[in-house]
């Protein structure tokens, strides 16, 4: 009896083992394809599908173009039909704080009254200078004598301000400090300012401080020769000419060397 039970229990085992082996074989088929490493291509494909426009019929498209309907517009215009143009009418508000500040400053400067205290009409003769010094002396010092010392800094400031505003010339701070009488101011303007005002060659150059350039015409002696100034434009022109000549000589030398090498 025990032997029969053993045989009966042993028989179903091969069937189960075959079923398990078949289950494993079916499960392996799930992983038979190769893995796709480009995972982001799925999102790219979905995005392209969303923005893809349907293809229109050729006959309908030709008809729309002939009739001039809005549906026949180009693809670029259809994509941009819902976009606003960057024009001032489409902006709301006053912009950034910096732009607002610049507008306020521009408006304030344009509306501010500037005091043009320096005269635009400049004196050019000795007679005008004599009249100007006399007016400044009488108004600020109450005297006619031009060789009198200034009583204090206030009187000197009033005199120099009146003289500069009426003559149209600014006087350097060094001269304003060292000169002490109206006569000294008169001599300074007559010797330093009026000659350069009447002769542009004697004009003061800020790029070359204290540079008064003499010319050969100013000296009658035969043993004095003055070399005239060479401007930067003339220097550049001369330099370009020299470089062109050098380049030409080098090209000729190279050409002769090549001809000699070919003939050898």
From Swiss-Prot:
- Compartments where located: Mitochondrion
Q: Does the keyword Zinc apply?
A: no
Molecular function terms, GO-annotated: structural constituent of ribosome
Q: In the UniProt record, which is one GO cellular component term?
A: mitochondrial inner membrane
Q: Give the transit peptide, as a residue range.
A: 1-75
Q: What does this protein do?
A: Component of the mitochondrial ribosome (mitoribosome), a dedicated translation machinery responsible for the synthesis of mitochondrial genome-encoded proteins, including at least some of the essential transmembrane subunits of the mitochondrial respiratory chain. The mitoribosomes are attached to the mitochondrial inner membrane and translation products are cotranslationally integrated into the membrane.
What further note is attached to this protein's record? Present with 1350 molecules/cell in log phase SD medium.
Name used for this protein in its record = Large ribosomal subunit protein mL50
Source species: Saccharomyces cerevisiae (strain ATCC 204508 / S288c)
Q: What is the lineage of its organism?
A: Eukaryota, Fungi, Dikarya, Ascomycota, Saccharomycotina
């Amino acid at each position: 009896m025990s032997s029969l039970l053993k045989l009966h229990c042993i028989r179903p085992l091969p069937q189960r083992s075959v079923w398990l082996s078949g289950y494993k074989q079916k499960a392996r088929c799930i992983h038979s394809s190769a893995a796709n490493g480009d995972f982001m291509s799925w999102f790219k494909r979905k995005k392209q599908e969303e923005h893809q426009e349907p293809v229109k019929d050729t006959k309908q498209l030709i008809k729309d173009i002939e009739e001039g309907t809005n549906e026949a517009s180009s693809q670029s215009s259809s994509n941009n039909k819902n976009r606003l143009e960057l024009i001032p009418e489409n902006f709301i508000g006053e912009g950034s704080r910096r732009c607002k500040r610049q507008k306020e400053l521009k408006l304030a400067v344009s509306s501010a009254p500037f005091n043009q205290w320096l005269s635009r009409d400049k004196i050019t003769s000795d007679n005008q200078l004599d009249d100007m010094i006399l007016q400044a002396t009488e108004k600020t010092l109450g005297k006619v004598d031009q060789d009198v010392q200034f009583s204090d800094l206030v009187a000197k400031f009033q005199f120099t301000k009146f003289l500069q505003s009426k003559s149209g010339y600014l006087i350097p701070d060094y001269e304003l400090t060292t000169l002490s009488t109206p006569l000294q101011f008169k001599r300074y303007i007559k010797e330093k300012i009026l000659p350069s005002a009447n002769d542009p060659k004697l004009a003061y150059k800020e790029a070359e401080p204290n540079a008064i350039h003499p010319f050969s015409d100013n000296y009658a002696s035969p043993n004095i020769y003055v070399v005239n100034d060479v401007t930067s434009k003339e220097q550049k022109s001369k330099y370009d000419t020299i470089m062109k000549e050098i380049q030409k000589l080098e090209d000729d030398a190279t050409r002769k060397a090549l001809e000699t090498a070919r003939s050898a």
